[in-house]
Regions:
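Cytoplasmic/organellar membrane-interface segments at the starts of transmembrane helices
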Residues: 111-113, 177-264
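Helix-loop interface residues and adjacent transmembrane-helix termini in multi-pass membrane transporters
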Residues: 38, 65, 95-98
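Residues that define the loop-to-transmembrane-helix transition and helix capping
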Residues: 18, 42, 68-69, 112-115
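Structural signature of hydrophobic alpha-helical transmembrane segments
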Residues: 13-26, 75-80
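C-terminal ends of transmembrane helices
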Residues: 29-46
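Single conserved hydrophobic/aromatic residue that forms the stacking wall/gate
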Residues: 1-6, 10
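Interfacial and helix-entry/exit segments of alpha-helical transmembrane bundles
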Residues: 21, 46-52, 56, 81-173, ...
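Alpha-helical transmembrane segments and their helix-entry boundary regions
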Residues: 8, 44-45, 67-71, 75
Length: 264
């Protein structure tokens, strides 16, 4: 029963691959463009999640080991880096009760530790080599790029153009996240009066540092040594793709016949 269920699941997924791949690519670019018009920092990070998870879907529907491993790894990495960004935004809000970028800036002057964590997790979210996001994003793009019908081992219905268009989202992400960092961290200090009743220090407290530091260490570990986690994922990926070689060639042949009929 488990094998039949997997076959049904993968068969349905194979039939939907071109449409889902297109939607994922659109989501990557569209989510990045929406980020440009946001003045609320929390909304910007939330919409960036829409863009980032488009890579996750693209890798998942590449239906090959690289894409599937990258997609699962992306979910973990996204939870680390974006979760940390939400924590950092909340820590600023607790002090100044605003998330408006027009009212916040130059926070490195008063909050150097917060600023260091902010820059670090922005770089993690940007998939800078050496940090966790790079490996998963690279695998998702490689999976989509190499998933072509003429690939004998892992044929698929995506291809290079999906990866190329999704790659533009990486450029847009770098632009809006670096713009966000530049406005919040650097420049002249600007912020509403701090809430003295919050009981919080000007910069991060030891408790807040204790929350962020393990996330930062995980980002470094997964960026430098992802092989341990990827080996753990391999059995699940192999089981998921067990019926794939039987189903995809059939789907490719069906699409070729349909194209000939439509062409005739």
């Amino acid at each position: 029963p488990d094998r039949r269920q997997r076959q049904m699941c993968i068969r349905d997924r194979v039939e939907a691959v071109p449409a889902i791949g297109a939607l994922a690519t659109i989501g990557v670019v569209y989510g990045a463009l929406i980020c440009w018009v946001q003045e609320d920092v929390k909304k910007l990070v939330a919409y960036s999640s829409v863009s980032h998870l488009g890579f996750c879907v693209l890798g998942l529907f590449a239906l090959n080991p690289s894409g599937l491993q990258g997609s699962i790894l992306y979910m973990i990495n996204h939870g680390l880096s974006t979760g940390a960004l939400f924590l950092l935004i909340g820590m600023v809000y607790e002090r100044y009760h605003t998330r408006d970028m027009n009212r916040l800036g130059g926070l490195v002057a008063n909050m150097p530790i917060w600023s260091a964590f902010m820059v670090f997790f922005v770089l993690s979210s940007l998939a800078v080599p050496g940090l966790n996001g790079f490996v998963s994003e690279f695998l998702c793009l490689i999976g989509a790029f190499s998933a072509t019908p003429d690939n004998a081992q892992w044929p698929g219905l995506l291809g290079p153009w999906y990866a190329v268009f999704a790659g533009t989202g990486m450029i847009l992400a770098a632009m809006y996240l670096l713009y966000l960092t530049g406005r919040l961290v650097w420049g002249p200090f600007r912020a509403p009066p701090a809430d003295k009743n919050s009981g919080l220090p000007t910069d991060l407290s030891s408790r807040e540092i204790g929350l962020l530091l393990p996330l930062a260490l995980m980002c470094v570990w997964l960026g430098v040594q992802p092989s341990g986690l990827m080996r753990t994922l391999e059995p699940s990926v192999e089981r998921t793709l067990a019926a794939y070689p039987e189903l995809v060639p059939t789907q490719v042949e069906s699409m070729a016949v349909l194209e000939e009929v439509n062409g005739g």
